[in-house]
Each structure stands twice: as C-alpha cells, then as structure tokens.
Amino acid sequence: MERNDAERKIEKLRNQLEEYGYHYYVLDKPLVSDAEYDGLMNELIELEEAFPELKSDTSPSVRVGGPPLPHFEKVEHRTPMLSLGNAFSDQDLRDFDRRVRQVVGDEVTYSCELKIDGLAISLIYESGRFVRGATRGDGTTGEDITQNLRTIPSIPLRLKEAVSLEVRGEAFMPKRSFEALNEAKEAAGEERFANPRNAAAGSLRQLDPKLAAKRHLDAFIYAIGSVEGKELHSHHEGLNYLKTIGFKINPESAYCESIDEVIDYVNSWLERRADLPYEIDGIVIKVDNVNFQEQLGYTAKSPRWAIAYKFPAEEVITTLLDITLNVGRTGVVTPTAELKPVTVAGTTVKRASLHNEDLIREKDIRLGDSVVVKKAGDIIPEVVNVLTELRTGEERPFSMPTHCPECGSELVRLEGEVALRCINPQCPAQIREGLIHFVSRQAMNIDGLGEKVITQLFEHGLIHNVADLYKLNKDELLQLERMGEKSVNNLLASIETSKKSSLERLLFGLGIRFVGSKAAKTLAMHFPTMTELRRASYDELIAVNEIGEKMAASIVSYFEKPEVNELIDELASLGVNMTYNGPKPIGEEEIADSPFAGKTVVLTGKLQALTRGEAKEKIEALGGKVTGSVSKNTDLLVAGEDAGSKLTKAKELNIEIWDEEALVKAISH
C-alpha cells in the first residue's frame, strides 16, 4: 500500500473506531459487535506498524498501551485539586445550606452527583487533543499518568470541539472488572485487591501502560477546572457542555431546587447504591450558580460551595483477638485491636485503633470479646462497642503497661492528656516514625522512601536521624530488599531534589510538637531563615498571628536542645535549604496599595518567570482573586506566551490586559 493510501485508510479507521468507542463506552449503545470492533482495531495497529511515521498519540490504537515508563513525572495542577468538607446527616446538609444562604441569599439551587469511590484525576486538552492527565497527589502537585489514562476507553483522546480546557473526574474500576481481576490474581497465586478503589489506583500507577489497559477501567468527568473561550453560568450547564463535546458524564446527576430536594436525592441512594455497577461512598452537593460559587470562595482545604455527604458506616461483628501497642513519633502509646479478619465496606479489616486506655476502660474491652466494628467515614476502622451478652467467661481484661514496649522507659501521662507517652528521645520507635514523617508528602516529599524502606534502613543501622538520609549511597541502598539499580537511582535523585525544599517543609518534617503544616508555613513566612527562627524569642513568636502560647513555648523549647541545633547544622552542611522560598507576608497597608486589591484576575498563556500556581499565590496574597475564565466580572487579564481565546474575549470586553513583565513588576514591589 502506498503511503498516501495508508494515510487515508488510517484516518478513516480512526474516525470509525472513535465513533464506535464513543457509542459503546460513553453512551452504552454499541453500534457494532465486539468482533467487528476488534477487527478494525487490529487493522489500524497493523497499518500504523507498517507506517510508523503516521502514528499519533490520539489514535484509538494507544488504548492497548505503549512501552513501559521509567517513572512518573511530577506535575503542578493549574488550580489546586481541593478536598471536600463532609456531612453525615440531614442536619449537616441543612447547616451547609444555611451557611450558603447567609452569603448568597435564598435563591440558591444545587447540583448533586454520586461520589464515585475511585481515583481523582485531572485531564488537560489543547485544541481538543488530550495532552496530559495527572493524579490529585497532594492537591497542588500530582503525578503524570497520561499514558495510562489513554488506555481508558471512556476518556476521549480527541474532543468534538477544538477547545482548550482542564477537566476533573474520577477513574474507577467497575465491580465486574474488579471481580474478574481478583479471580485472575487468585488463580495466579497472587494477593487479591481489597477493594475496587485500591485496584483502580494500583492500575493507574503501573509503569507499564499495557498492564493498565488490561484492567478495564472507566471514568466519569464531573467538573471543569478551566476553559478558554467559553462562559458557563452554572455547574449543570458545564456538565451538559462536557457531554456534548464527548466526555462521559454520570447520568445519575441531578439538579435540585432546594435543600429538601437534595436530602430526598441523598436518601434515595442509601438503598439503591448496592445496585450500581460501581462503588460509591456518598453524594457530592454543589452550589449550582458559578457566580455564587465565586462569592462563597474557599477555605485552605476545601470550597465553601460544595460538600460531600458520606453514607453511614457499615457495621459488622468480629472477635477481638489481642491488643497490641504502637509508639508514635511524639511518644504517644496507642493501643490497637487485633481482630479476626472481617470485611467492612469492601475492605478486609484486621486492626482497629482503640485510641487510649480510658476508652478501653470506658467500653470495658477485653481480649476475646465479640465487638462491633465500623469504618468511620468509611476510612478508619473503629471498635464501636462490646457485645457483653456474648461473653463466655473466658475473656481477659487488658491493662496498659507502665513501661514503653519499644525501649523500656517509664511511661508518663502529661498534665491535661489522656494518652500515655514515652519521653525517651532515643526511643527507636519514635526515631523510626519521625523518619517516616520527615520524608512524607507534606514534609520533604522524598519519593521512594516509604515506610518499608525506612524500616529496612533503620533496622540495618544505615540511618539514625534525618541527616543520615542525605548520606546514603548507591551501594548501601542496593543491599535492601526489592531495590534494583533503577529504583536506587530514582531514590537518590529524589533525595537530592528534596534538599531544595522551602523552609516550611523542613520545619514540618522536623516534627516540632504542635507545629502542623499550616503553622510551619506561617513561621517560615515570618522568620524566613532557620537562623532567624532559632533566635526568635517567645514574645516574638506569640506576636505572630496563629502562633499561640503552647506552640510558641514548644518552639522555644525545641531550639534550646543542643542535639537539635547539631542536627540542623549537619543538615545545612549536607546542602539542605534553610530559607523560605515562597511569597513574603503582606501587611494590610501594602494590600490596600496593591494593584490587585479587590480585583478579579485571570491568567492565560505560558508564563516563563514563575508557574501559574506561584503567580496565583502571590496575586491572592496581595488581595486579588484569581479565576479560570474571562467574564464581565473580570478586572484584569495577565497574558503569557501563546495566549488564546481568553485574550480575544478580554479585548472584546475592554478588560485591562497585562503581559508577564507587568505582572512580575507588580508582585515584586
């Protein structure tokens, strides 16, 4: 076949397969048999192999998966992928409605959607072509899993409109696919997946896209993150638009004109959810009007215009076999119930937290008891109560120890606390847990250093404190179980990258008592070098908004310890950054004088000097509000390179337009 003939045939096959795939996977209305579809796909693959220069990353043939990837790259989300606040009762929903109406008035309506139990994803399209897909990650930074997402048939590779946009959705594994996968794993002598959510997440984190393609995943799209050249006034209007350009939208979504209708919708799914072909763990309720959403805004963690109703936790009965003790990084000794394995909310549960000695005494929990277990919020296993009527007389009371189970030091109960605590700073359990915390995502974010690797390193005597992580070498790491050369090289690169982390990550990672990630950011903004923070007095600390007396006293006490100062000096000598890299705190007077104060700003095009996330953070610190689309309410558009339809629309609406140079100048003053 001549090249020109092949090109025409390939394009025809692609169009046919796209149309058949859309009807089968999105509309659930197949036009041809599976055998006919497979025959056309094989014909396309053969032609693309014969003419490799005609291959395309939007061809339906990529659904079968490409070559294995060396690792997943990290990518920054254009706008953060926030979590949602939770509701557990009708009253919680009414309270949410009351808070909304206090801000926007009584003319509020809602969009309701099933909360799919899967993996949150972000998809980016440029001129209608799928160019990047990522996991949620920590909400700001995720992993690029584009190649694996291309294998999901319901995710369009080309849209029906040449639009540039970002959408949010949920990738999931249908129940039928999950059952088939577990049957295959069992037949192969492998461990079964606990639930479809874990199976979906594991499938999308396969480095070999061909394996992901065999897992038969699906995806629903539920929101637009940003879109160029399209003004949408409501959430349900946005969903309808997404459907028309080729996305799979959950047909069970509903528009509700009052909170009573929302509650009826929620309650209707309490029984019906078991009949769905996929798992759901609740209902998402969103204020429908986009302008109302903007008025309500966001907290640090979630939008104020949306909430997730979580279904009541499933409760089951099992036997409490034993109570074991765990020592955390702060020395708190937590009793854990060891249970006869039981399935709760689709997950095999073997352990549940008992929190502290007072709870054990209060519930009269004994070894051998029959207990009721549930998963609070369908996440954390919890012992609800004891079925004392089932006791046989062989059950044994449990007493908390007087000494640490890890190091033997005497346990203490600090004033005002119910927990028993080991106060030995050399306790191996505390050191190990502290190391795990230091490398975690919100702290130094060292990929490849999970709990198992840290435990191995610690038990082999290769690390004793966090500074030792930066002294690890290739030969030492190759001695560990399941660590090949590629894994070791990636890990060493990740350790090296973490040295550049901003000061707030290091502060959070050090595990100073009472200092969470938000407080660490506040401290770093006000004391932008480790030297300044180490010298800060108690009075200087409590003068900072959000730093209370207890936290200030803890920080002063922490930096008074010689071993702490030795550790920090050692980290600095190993090249770990000791300065704050983010925007400086802005005073009220400076905000009032800012060119962004009270203005709605839109960013478009590629920025060179800083990322969109950095620009957004700095504009908002100076009193501005950054949104994703241009409208009559937009005050200012910042246009980077290759600015598209947003720039055109801004000109039509006579909106003020800046280039990147003007932006950098404004945020630098």
Curated annotation (Swiss-Prot):
<keyword id="KW-0227">DNA damage</keyword>
<feature type="binding site">
    <location>
        <position position="404"/>
    </location>
    <ligand>
        <name>Zn(2+)</name>
    </ligand>
</feature>
<dbReference type="InterPro" id="IPR004149">
    <property type="entry name" value="Znf_DNAligase_C4"/>
</dbReference>
<dbReference type="InterPro" id="IPR013840">
    <property type="entry name" value="DNAligase_N"/>
</dbReference>
<feature type="domain" description="BRCT">
    <location>
        <begin position="591"/>
        <end position="669"/>
    </location>
</feature>
<comment type="function">
    <text>DNA ligase that catalyzes the formation of phosphodiester linkages between 5'-phosphoryl and 3'-hydroxyl groups in double-stranded DNA using NAD as a coenzyme and as the energy source for the reaction. It is essential for DNA replication and repair of damaged DNA.</text>
</comment>
<feature type="binding site">
    <location>
        <position position="407"/>
    </location>
    <ligand>
        <name>Zn(2+)</name>
    </ligand>
</feature>
<feature type="binding site">
    <location>
        <begin position="34"/>
        <end position="38"/>
    </location>
    <ligand>
        <name>NAD(+)</name>
    </ligand>
</feature>
<dbReference type="Pfam" id="PF01653">
    <property type="entry name" value="DNA_ligase_aden"/>
</dbReference>
<feature type="binding site">
    <location>
        <position position="136"/>
    </location>
    <ligand>
        <name>NAD(+)</name>
    </ligand>
</feature>
<dbReference type="InterPro" id="IPR013839">
    <property type="entry name" value="DNAligase_adenylation"/>
</dbReference>
<dbReference type="Pfam" id="PF00533">
    <property type="entry name" value="BRCT"/>
</dbReference>
<dbReference type="InterPro" id="IPR018239">
    <property type="entry name" value="DNA_ligase_AS"/>
</dbReference>
<dbReference type="InterPro" id="IPR004150">
    <property type="entry name" value="NAD_DNA_ligase_OB"/>
</dbReference>
<keyword id="KW-0235">DNA replication</keyword>
<keyword id="KW-0436">Ligase</keyword>
<keyword id="KW-0862">Zinc</keyword>
<feature type="binding site">
    <location>
        <position position="286"/>
    </location>
    <ligand>
        <name>NAD(+)</name>
    </ligand>
</feature>
<keyword id="KW-0464">Manganese</keyword>
<dbReference type="GO" id="GO:0005829">
    <property type="term" value="C:cytosol"/>
</dbReference>
<dbReference type="GO" id="GO:0006281">
    <property type="term" value="P:DNA repair"/>
</dbReference>
<keyword id="KW-0234">DNA repair</keyword>
<dbReference type="Pfam" id="PF03120">
    <property type="entry name" value="DNA_ligase_OB"/>
</dbReference>
<dbReference type="InterPro" id="IPR010994">
    <property type="entry name" value="RuvA_2-like"/>
</dbReference>
<feature type="binding site">
    <location>
        <position position="310"/>
    </location>
    <ligand>
        <name>NAD(+)</name>
    </ligand>
</feature>
<dbReference type="InterPro" id="IPR003583">
    <property type="entry name" value="Hlx-hairpin-Hlx_DNA-bd_motif"/>
</dbReference>
<feature type="binding site">
    <location>
        <position position="422"/>
    </location>
    <ligand>
        <name>Zn(2+)</name>
    </ligand>
</feature>
<dbReference type="InterPro" id="IPR036420">
    <property type="entry name" value="BRCT_dom_sf"/>
</dbReference>
<feature type="binding site">
    <location>
        <position position="113"/>
    </location>
    <ligand>
        <name>NAD(+)</name>
    </ligand>
</feature>
<dbReference type="Pfam" id="PF22745">
    <property type="entry name" value="Nlig-Ia"/>
</dbReference>
<feature type="active site" description="N6-AMP-lysine intermediate">
    <location>
        <position position="115"/>
    </location>
</feature>
<dbReference type="InterPro" id="IPR012340">
    <property type="entry name" value="NA-bd_OB-fold"/>
</dbReference>
<dbReference type="Pfam" id="PF03119">
    <property type="entry name" value="DNA_ligase_ZBD"/>
</dbReference>
<dbReference type="GO" id="GO:0003677">
    <property type="term" value="F:DNA binding"/>
</dbReference>
<dbReference type="InterPro" id="IPR033136">
    <property type="entry name" value="DNA_ligase_CS"/>
</dbReference>
<keyword id="KW-0460">Magnesium</keyword>
<feature type="binding site">
    <location>
        <position position="427"/>
    </location>
    <ligand>
        <name>Zn(2+)</name>
    </ligand>
</feature>
<protein>
    <recommendedName>
        <fullName>DNA ligase</fullName>
        <ecNumber>6.5.1.2</ecNumber>
    </recommendedName>
</protein>
<feature type="binding site">
    <location>
        <begin position="83"/>
        <end position="84"/>
    </location>
    <ligand>
        <name>NAD(+)</name>
    </ligand>
</feature>
<dbReference type="Pfam" id="PF12826">
    <property type="entry name" value="HHH_2"/>
</dbReference>
<keyword id="KW-0479">Metal-binding</keyword>
<feature type="binding site">
    <location>
        <position position="170"/>
    </location>
    <ligand>
        <name>NAD(+)</name>
    </ligand>
</feature>
